[in-house]
Structure formats: C-alpha cells, structure tokens
C-alpha cells in the first residue's frame, strides 16, 4: 500500500491475537519427530524430493513399475525407504495437512450417468483461512481499502485500491476486514491419480495478497479447492450440456457453502502476523474463458456473461 494513501476509516481493525498457519503445525501428531527430521517420514531431503517427483509426475501404475525396476535389486545401490506405491502415498498423506480432501458422491434424480459422479473437494473457507494466515505473505498483504494520489491523479493497483473495495467496505460492520475471493478454473482435464477419470481443477486465492506475489507459481498463492467431475449422462445429446452445467453449479454450492456464509455473516480469523480480524469474503473475480463464463452466468453461448447486450449488439 502506498505511503501517502488514504485508508477507509472503518476497516481493518484487530480483535486480539491468535495462531497463524505456522503455529498450527505443532498440532500434527508427528510434530515431535519433525523437530529432529523435518522431512519425516522420509529419510532425508533427497528421499522426499524423489517421492514428491514420483507423486507429481507419474500415475499410480507408473510409480509401481518404477519401484519394481531391477535397478533397485543391486545391494550396492541406494533404495528408497518406501518400497511400494501404497507406502509412498500413505507417507504423503501423513504429512501435515491443514485442510483435508473429501470425496462426495452426487446423484441426479431421474438421470443416470455412464460412471458414478464423485466430487473431490476441500472446504473453501478453510483453504482461505490457511491462505490468510500464511506467514509467507506477511509482508505482501493489504487489509484496508485505500485511495492513493500521485501528481493529482488517482493511482490504481491491486483490488484494495479500486472503487469497488471502498464501496463494499461501506456496507460492512465497523472494523471489518475484506478478504476478496478470486476464483480460477481451467477445463484442462486431470487424470493422474484419478483412476483415468477426467476432472477439472478449481482454484482460489485472495485479493489481499499483492498481485506480483500471486502471479508467482512457486509461492503457491493459488490453492486448488476442488476437482470438478467430467461426466456423461445417459440422455439425448441435446440435454447433455444442460445437465453438465447443472452438475457444475451443484458442486460449486457444496465446495463454497461455508465461504458464502462468511461473505454474508462474517467470521474471525488470524492474519499472517497472528492478529485476529473480523473477516468478510466477497467474491470479486472469477478467471475463466468465455464458454465457462457463459455457463457460470447461466446464459446462452451467444450472450454476454457480463452485460445485458444481445448478440446483435456485439461488436
């Protein structure tokens, strides 16, 4: 935030001190072991990097084939402590996890699908709490809407410098802090570790984090909250896209149910510096392509997802 900025007078108050994301690592059942070996249950950093590479780049079948290579049979060669794919995945699952993944089976009354519908997801509110309290972003976050001037001209930068942030703050309780929600989705199918079933990832980040930091993939400011199932219904092709769109909205309702409550009623959560804030979570942007934007807005593909302009009025 610029030094000469004028902040909204009713925003960003602190209501005590809590625990940030780093503090909660001590709650893990293996925290005492990781004080000796930070890569536990892996033997060392090198073994952790190997396991991470296998999980991120190979399918489960490929991991099994790799670990059964005769290259590992030589007694003079180092062999990883994990000897099977299941052992590796169990170790990865035992690593500290702040927001657990869930699998929910969904059904549409009156409509059958070729394969069962399974949504892999996390509670979006818990993911946002994790992001908001991550010490990695402590020096790169803004909590108050502001107006910055330079040479008699208004300066615009991140979300908190926009008129929208100021106007939303006017409707929030005294002292509240906005945590603007930014969603991102991509129809690139994900099949690895999903048994060959196609899924589309949904990502979330918060507008408090500086845009330059959000754009760096290595800092993981974008977090995956769900893998949307790609299913085929046993219906006439004319109804296929309608049912798929309805399924998408049903999944989003489930993933973001608690986050919508926080947007309406607010909740308290600690920031990276452990200060507790009264937070509201308005949705301010959804980054996606045009076909998906029309589906989200529930309009036909020839209509504008943002305006009331008709097809004939398009430039």
What is the predicted role of each segment?
Residues 1-315:
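Long, charged/polar, flexible scaffold/linker tracts and peripheral helical/loop segments
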